[in-house]
Each structure stands twice: as C-alpha cells, then as structure tokens.
Amino acid sequence: MNTGRRDPVVTVQGRSTEPTYEVRGGLEGDVFPVFANYASFQRPTERETGTVTVTVTNSTDSLVRNRVAVQVQGWSDQEIQVTEIAAGQVRKLLFAPTFRARLYQNREITAATALVSVTDMGGHEVFSTTVPLRLRSADDIYWGANFEYAQFIASWVTPHDPRVEAVLSRAKELMPGRRLPGYETWRAPGVQEKTTLAQVKAIYRALQRKGVSYVKSSSTMGAHVNADVTERVRMPHESLGHVSANCIDGVVLYASLFENLGMDPVIVLVPGHAYVGVRLAQDSTQFLYVETAVTGRLPFEVAVKSATAGMAKYSESQIIRIPITQAREAGIYPMPASSKEAQSASVDAREANQNSLP
C-alpha cells in the first residue's frame, strides 16, 4: 500500500554479480487485518497492496529466476511466487498470505515475524531473512490521509452474522404479517418506499428493545495512532454481544442488517461523525438516513430527523458516501469471524429465536 510513508526495510547487499533483495513489512511494520484479508483475495499480479513486499533488483547481466516464499510464522499459510527478472531490471512482489482464524480473534497489537526465503530454480537458497511485524487488532481500521481508505469500512458490514440474523428475527415480529421482505421490486416505487420505512423502523425498535446504547470507545495503539487516520470499530457481533456501540459501530451494525435483507445500505462520513442510509426502493435515488447514536434513548422519527439535520450542516465536499454494493464489487468483503465468535453468536441467535418478541 502506497501511503507516502517510509516503511521498515531489511536490505541484504550481494556481490555486484548477484541480485539484491529488499523486504518491507506492512505500514511501518503494522499489519491491519482488514487490508490483509482484502489482498489475500486477489491474484498477486492484481494487488496494489500486500502484507509483505519483496523487491528483487537484478544487477547481473543475465536473466534471474527465483522462487520466493513468505509466511507469517504461526499466523498464516505460506505464499509462493515464481518470478523472472531480466538483467538490469527491478521487480516488486506483493505477498498477502492467507491468515488463520486467530488473526481475526486478536484484539490487541501483537508481535509476529515474517519469514522470507528465496531459492533458485534448482532449489538452492540464495537469500533468507525475517522481518518483525506488529499485527493490529482485528477491530482497527486505518482510514488514511483524507480518508482515502474509507471504503474498507465495508469489511465491518457482516450481513450473515448469526447475531445480526437474530435481530432480524426479533424485528419481523414488529412488522405487519411478520415479514421483512426487503425490496419487493414487483410493487410500485411508492409502496416499496413505505415498506422500507416500516422495516427500518422495526429494526430500530428491535435494537432498542435489545438495549443497544451509545458508548464512546475508539482508542487504539500502534505506529498509526492519530485519531484522524486510525480508529477502533467494533464488529456487529461485538456491539450486539455488549449491547453498546459508538456512532461508527452502530452504522456498520445497521448496514449489516440492511444488507442481509438485500437492501442497498450506504455509510456516510462527515467530520467527526457517521450516519447510515438505505435506498428506499431498488431503483430509487432517494435514501432514508438514520442517526444510530440515539438508538437507545430516542424514538425512530427523531433519529431520522437528526440524521437529515446533521448531514445538512455540511457541504457535499465534506461528505463521504460509501455504498456497500460498490465496495463488494471492488472486492471488499466482510472480515471472517473466528470459529469461537461464530459459535458464541450461534448460541445467542438460538436463544433469541426461542424468545422472539410477541
């Protein structure tokens, strides 16, 4: 990822007749799980970012063929790339080995080591080194300068989380006919909009009855600690498990609920705050916006008015909109839940279904 910052570098200089290798790890050594997960879905040749970058400089007068292997010991699978570098050329290889579930269980900054090994095509090792890494909490998002990585907040939108589905089971009990149909495209747009409004209100009331309330908690630690670029964001299962959320936590929770229903959610960032919106009908250009921070204490109608009034204070140039559908099309998928979290959420979901609202 090109952030304009100087990353830690490990360089080993060979003789002038041999290639040289330079290894960089993360962002100043920090590995954010959201970026690692995104890059691991991509083919190496399509990546613009990686967990580990290996730069091969062929200072010889002949073609060099290498087999390069990278693994974060104890945390990831091994990724192997085979490359050819023409005489006098430089090749940058971006590695994003698939991480094991424990990375997504991690809630504190943790030290790790990347092992890099290079062999020739005959299997002889020509270079090896280790690079220290700091694995960030799975909750940490790096917004970047001017929120250039804001689209990655879509990884916190987890529509198929069992706890999200449990909320929807409760919300449908508050709907006429006990249905949450999402968009019914065969209906007239005006009817769709009324149905969407009713569904969003039912979800809001279900979260109120569950006791979800606002709690400010966004501190994080690491090399990137500027509150303007790095923030802790709870996953929806955490917010529901602790029945507490700050504004951005609530936004990704609501967006998860909307996406589960096949609706089109949008996350809206303004200076110092965030709102969630949902398209009123499938082909509509109109969105319904909600102030999620007041879920625990104010009626739904007030939450809608508060969001509309809050957004009206800013010019379009100050507003960042992140349509979740577009993020998915760009390859930004939900971060995986650990097996422990999934099991706990499934138990909660079963209990919720057994105790649905009357």
Cite the ranges covered by each PLM segment.
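A structural boundary/capping signal
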Residues: 2-358
